[in-house]
A protein has these predicted regions:
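The Walker A/P-loop phosphate-binding site
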Residues: 1-83, 166
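Conserved inter-motif catalytic segment of the P-loop NTP-binding fold
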Residues: 58-144, 148
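Active-site-proximal loop/turn and secondary-structure-junction residues that shape catalytic pockets
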Residues: 134, 170-171
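Substrate-engagement module of ASCE P-loop NTPases
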Residues: 147-170
Length: 171
């Protein structure tokens, strides 16, 4: 019997995310990708609806890990505050269920190593956001490197039973 994976993310009532899988947002610069991701994460923090996005993370998968590979610490802090405001949560308190890391200064290999380490040590992560998936690669035009990265995302999503939502910025 095939077991249907738990649905955890919806937009306008249509499923966009399940545990054990991954998805992506793509678009050109300034096309509101990060704003939409902010609404998704805010919905996941509330386990409710924010704007047109809805989320339900099971009790044992309530933690959200947000990885940004491109922006400065200042801009990442602004994104984190926006997420908390959208969720109706205080912006001046640390949360156990929301971890935001900035990997701008790291190499692609080090970024993957850090994310893997965090997932290994945080079994309650239900949603991983990677804002800037391209920065986990050296050469975006390399078929073998692209395949390796997709395989890594598949291993992480199924192995840790979480949903990975990536952001790919188009030029």
């Amino acid at each position: 019997t095939y077991e249907v994976p738990p649905e955890i993310l919806w937009v306008n009532g249509s499923t966009i995310g399940t545990l054990g899988n991954f998805s992506a947002s793509t678009g050109k610069a300034k096309s509101k990708k990060t704003f939409n991701i902010s609404a998704i994460v805010a919905a996941a923090l509330k386990n409710d609806e924010v704007l047109k996005y809805s989320a339900y993370l099971p009790p044992n998968k309530r933690k959200i890990l947000y990885v940004d590979t491109e922006q400065s610490k200042y801009h990442c802090h602004k994104v984190m505050e926006r997420i908390l405001r959208l969720a109706g949560l205080p912006t001046d308190k640390d949360r156990d269920d929301f971890v935001f890391i900035v990997l701008r200064e790291q190499t692609p290999d080090k970024r993957k190593q850090i994310i893997g380490y965090m997932l290994e040590n945080m079994p309650d992560v239900g949603l991983l956001i990677i804002d800037g998936i391209r920065d986990l690669m050296y050469d975006i035009n390399s078929p073998s490197e692209s395949t390796d990265l997709i395989n890594l995302l598949m291993r992480w999503s199924s192995g840790y039973n979480l949903h990975i939502h990536t952001v790919l910025h188009l030029n």
